[in-house]
Amino acid sequence: MCEEETTALVCDNGSGLCKAGFAGDDAPRAVFPSIVGRPRHQGVMVGMGQKDSYVGDEAQSKRGILTLKYPIEHGIITNWDDMEKIWHHSFYNELRVAPEEHPTLLTEAPLNPKANREKMTQIMFETFNVPAMYVAIQAVLSLYASGRTTGIVLDSGDGVTHNVPIYEGYALPHAIMRLDLAGRDLTDYLMKILTERGYSFVTTAEREIVRDIKEKLCYVALDFENEMATAASSSSLEKSYELPDGQVITIGNERFRCPETLFQPSFIGMESAGIHETTYNSIMKCDIDIRKDLYANNVLSGGTTMYPGIADRMQKEITALAPSTMKIKIIAPPERKYSVWIGGSILASLSTFQQMWISKPEYDEAGPSIVHRKCF
């Protein structure tokens, strides 16, 4: 336990899940939903010790009586009071540490507004009194976790998808692509197409069931048209799923129609390019001399890249777009669901990183704007 006295904390705040733990560990200790719930009704049972707000798993389990809010929308923090509750929950309830004793590494979405980084810095030093902190870009951490400093990361989570080209450890902001299409939208789309099949999923509780179906049964087809033909002519692609009440439902072409939306956003009425095209467009916005390195280092990260078949499909689609002689490699690490956190854990435990922290005295002298000078 002596070790943990000065260990840095790493907190990766995603739109869907918050991942928190100690630098140097190979996986986060705590993973919980980024939600804050408040009671919808006045408590009637006296002395029940009802709280005015619940965070994470507890909010999820009591969702029937709560109004749930996600403080992080599309990767960017929009509700600071709720965000403070999530950080408080991470430190005190999940990790059981006193933040004033640990340097803390936070993550941010690519192209996070400047005011947001300052606000994060301010809350860490003034509300939680951390001795030191740092803010790192999520996609850059994923790249570190894969053992690279140059490459293009496709980071797709619950709320947002980004393509981030990185050269020698620096993200190239002019070429970053953002797509507001991610896990939550795919869950919604799966709810919609299952409803068309005659199964009814409407409430937030049922939405969690659909998310589970999505995570267990969906996959990306290598050739969508062929797969649709196979599904129509045989039942080889059908799988059954048992609902919590014991009812069994059968799911067929929905298994690959759902994630196909990533490649064809028009499925949900979005006028946007698919993830293969945004990857290509992002590479084309980079300097001609580094494109070769980016094509050869396509790193997938985030929970929405966990579909079986996604790497092969990306390989096929990007090969079709790129020059014919180009070597294209898609890297899909098995732990990519948590690779942002893992990259943070690696970074915060490097000896060379220790002078990069923003310390409390530096903050007191310069104020929140110091984050732009020290974290880039």
UniProtKB/Swiss-Prot annotation:
It catalyses: ATP + H2O = ADP + phosphate + H(+). Oxidation of Met-45 and Met-48 by MICALs (MICAL1, MICAL2 or MICAL3) to form methionine sulfoxide promotes actin filament depolymerization. MICAL1 and MICAL2 produce the (R)-S-oxide form. The (R)-S-oxide form is reverted by MSRB1 and MSRB2, which promotes actin repolymerization. It comes from the Eukaryota. The modification N-acetylglutamate is found at E3. There is a cross-link at E271 (Isoglutamyl lysine isopeptide (Glu-Lys) (interchain with K-51)). It comes from Homo sapiens (Human). Changing R178C: In MMIHS5; interferes with proper polymerization into thin filaments leading to impaired contractility of the smooth muscle. It is linked to Visceral myopathy 1: An autosomal dominant form of myopathic pseudo-obstruction characterized by impaired function of enteric smooth muscle cells, resulting in abnormal intestinal motility, severe abdominal pain, malnutrition, and even death. The disease shows inter- and intrafamilial variability. Most severely affected patients exhibit prenatal bladder enlargement, intestinal malrotation, neonatal functional gastrointestinal obstruction, and dependence on total parenteral nutrition and urinary catheterization. Megacystis-microcolon-intestinal hypoperistalsis syndrome 5: A form of megacystis-microcolon-intestinal hypoperistalsis syndrome, a congenital visceral myopathy primarily affecting females, and characterized by loss of smooth muscle contraction in the bladder and intestine. Affected individuals present at birth with functional obstruction of intestine, microcolon, dilation of bladder, and secondary hydronephrosis. The majority of cases have a fatal outcome due to malnutrition and sepsis, followed by multiorgan failure. Actins are highly conserved proteins that are involved in various types of cell motility and are ubiquitously expressed in all eukaryotic cells. This is Actin, gamma-enteric smooth muscle. SMART domains: ACTIN. SUPFAM superfamilies: Actin-like ATPase domain (SSF53067). Changing R63Q: In MMIHS5; interferes with proper polymerization into thin filaments. In vertebrates 3 main groups of actin isoforms, alpha, beta and gamma have been identified. The alpha actins are found in muscle tissues and are a major constituent of the contractile apparatus. The beta and gamma actins coexist in most cell types as components of the cytoskeleton and as mediators of internal cell motility. The modification Methionine (R)-sulfoxide is found at M45, M48. Its main location: cytoplasm. One of its GO terms (biological process) is mesenchyme migration. It is an enzyme of class 3 (hydrolase). GO terms for molecular function: ATP binding; hydrolase activity.
